[in-house]
Amino acid sequence: MENTTPLRKQYLDIKKNYPEAIVFFRLGDFYETFEEDARIAARELEIVLTSREMGKGLKVPLAGIPYHALDNYLSRLINKGYKVAICEQVTKPGETKGLVQRQVTRLVTPGTVVEPNLLQTKQNNFLLSLYLTEDSCGLAFADISTSEFGCTQTNIGELEAEISRLSPAEIILPKNQSLNLPIHLKATISKLDGYYFEADIAREHLLRHFECQNLSAYGCENMPLAISAAGALLNYLEETQKSSLKQLERLSVYTTADYMQMDSHTLSNLEIFRSSGGNSLKGSLLGILDQTRTAMGGRLLRKFLGQPLLKQSDIEKRLSAVDYFFEESLARTSLAKSLGQIADMERMANRIRQKTILPRELISLKNSLETVSAIHRQFGLMPPPRLAYFLNGLKPLPEMLDIINKTITDDPPSTLGDGKVIRAGFDPEMDKLCSLAGDARTFLSQMETRERERTGIKSLKLGYNRVFGYYIEISNANLGDMPPEFIRKQTLVNAERFITPELKEYENLILNAKERLLEMETGLYEQVLNQLGGFYSALLANAAALAALDVLSAFAEVAVRNSYVRPVFHPENRLDIRKGRHPMVEQGLGYGSFVANDISLSAEDCQIIILTGPNMAGKSTYLKQTALIVLMAQIGSYVPAETAELCLTDRIFTRIGAREDLSAGQSTFMVEMVETASILNTATSRSLLILDEIGRGTSTYDGLAIAQAVVEYIHSQPSLTAKTLFATHYHELVELASYLPRVKNYNIAVSEDRGEVVFLHKIVPGGVDKSYGIHVAKLAGLPKWVIKRAYEVLTELENPAKKQPKSRTCQPQLQLPMTGQTSVLEEEIKELEIESLTPLAALNKLYELKKKAEEQGL
């Protein structure tokens, strides 16, 4: 360290406190990175890697970015999961002896971003904190850009569903704990010392933050794990933000039982937030329903989809509001136009509180507040009864508007310092400084004209740069006419630059005025933000009301465009959907092309539907559309059907498709069985089960046996009786309906004509005993030879008696037992009571006997 420069010592002292972050070290007009940070920055940001001498014989890797381009480069690093420590100069050159003082003013991580251009407008940016035990979990989340702060305590089995629903950008855990993330989720994992998760420490942190004596008012006193997670989250935010967290003024405590539950597989299988094919918004349910016009509405829609309601009265309130907008097309159209002019008031309110909002954004806020007044005149003065519940927070804020109008210019720049942010007349002293700066500019223009005339040098010009200040520039060709009082300041290739005593005097005057102007404008702007901060709660209330109106009117717009209907809820444990449709598939096919289907499920008479039929005929679509209609109804949306009579569903489970969990060392079949076990162990009589091809991941007989046992279990367990759609390629399962009274068979209708097969996509009663797999293979484009040979093999398998061996070179003969001898196998066959066997049991017995015969060499 003896040969290290003071600047490097300063950097190393700061860097040691942020070993996991890239340190952006402010040096004048640049943020510099050093050593390994520089190598990472150069690689990820595609900037030049150079070096700087920072001690005797010591050259250190260096890569820098201009300070004004920070947000652009910052977003690229954060999106790749890096953390960045912003180290600023906190004193001015000359104010202190030696180096300018520097300190980290903020640690930017994926879960603590607040800059508008780094955030997804219609998606929350959640930081998630977890504290795990063997069978339970404390969970807390916060979005500091919107002031949301919540927590819960749940069993470990429901954790993955909550993580998928929240889709956090960053997760914090104690150092001694680990977590397997859902396969689709890309979140940064940050580790905290376990000390911050200790119950007493975390509780004290929360009490201090909320300035209260206990947590009973928040409803989490009996959630020790949730308290641990929430307290640790607060600590992490304080460490990263280096500022007050006053915007987190409420803690929303909830339980997963408050809402319909869907695990991560269900969210993925039903394509709620993203399509399975392109992993994008297009093709998802969110993509269909999101006709929202505001950022707040878009985020609220995501919340609705992740937490369908279980309280019928709350659902009916939403449906009644959708009714209003469905019927009142002029009101819906007018509102949509107004909402399109509303900025992200929720995030703006928080940036006002944090004093990070830009002057130009205040004009956008002003325009939004004017639109709020117009919307209030339309709906708030005489609220339509069906909207009244959602209009409570909608109130004009004329005082806030007045403050912005009186203090901020109509077209302010993004930054402070030029005297163009604060409106003239607001502060007399600042007006004087602005006038002085303006007069100086006029003086310099006049001086340039005067010096040209005095010297006769027509090309003479006055200029300014940050290094040399103000100067007079004369080309080399005119240096002979230069007056003697000009003092040389800089030599260029084709010109020389000079100063004069008069110019230097005005330079000092102007620079002092600009410095004072920056200080004064900054101070006045902060005063304005303090005043606007007094409207924080009212601004958030308006944002919440507008978000609700946005989502509910969007539901109506989607319903009108796609001919959806209002669902009806009843207390019986049944659902009855007439001409139901799959919302995403229908849109992909185009209007009128989708084949609608009915479904009736009831705990009393049709609890389980066994659905058979060929692949690609529409089984999965039918299963999924039923679940989607139930979900849509419980978020308060109209549904794609002719009629829909539903009961409240507490959970939707789906077991669809095949996938491996390589990270856990689990095969496709093991994953299938784990998911099936979870469903059977947690479903209730009010659940909806969507089971597709259970048992296909193992041998035919094992799979068939498991599939049958699962159906029998769902049917026979008194505490279960969940409404179930069970699609299968095991045609033998249709026999279950003969002795399980609440099992019904349905199949996909198929038309055959002269060897051509047409899938009608219509669900009809009854089972099928024929597969059309080869036809599907033909549609997929397999070679004609393969298709022809497959039909030959199929014929042989279906008619074994007619099968003729291709070669008869060696035909071993069976050794028949001698007269009077009886084998054990024969005795077992004789003892069979064939009349009491079901077809499926007989098939299983035949398989068993065949296996024994092979073992005996028969």
Curated annotation (Swiss-Prot):
CDD domains: ABC_MutS1 (cd03284). GO terms for biological process: mismatch repair. ATP binds at residues 613-620. InterPro entries: DNA_mismatch_repair_MutS, DNA_mismatch_repair_MutS-lik_N, DNA_mismatch_repair_MutS/MSH, DNA_mismatch_repair_MutS_C, DNA_mismatch_repair_MutS_clamp, DNA_mismatch_repair_MutS_core, DNA_mismatch_repair_MutS_N, DNA_mismatch_repair_MutS_sf. GO terms for cellular component: cytosol. The keyword DNA repair applies. Keywords: ATP-binding, DNA damage, DNA repair, DNA-binding, Nucleotide-binding. It comes from the Bacteria. SMART domains: MUTSac, MUTSd. Pfam families: MutS_I, MutS_II, MutS_III, MutS_IV, MutS_V. One of its GO terms (molecular function) is ATP-dependent DNA damage sensor activity. The keyword ATP-binding applies. Belongs to the DNA mismatch repair MutS family. This protein is involved in the repair of mismatches in DNA. It is possible that it carries out the mismatch recognition step. This protein has a weak ATPase activity. This is DNA mismatch repair protein MutS. The lineage of its organism: Bacteria, Bacillati, Chloroflexota, Dehalococcoidia, Dehalococcoidales. The gene is mutS.
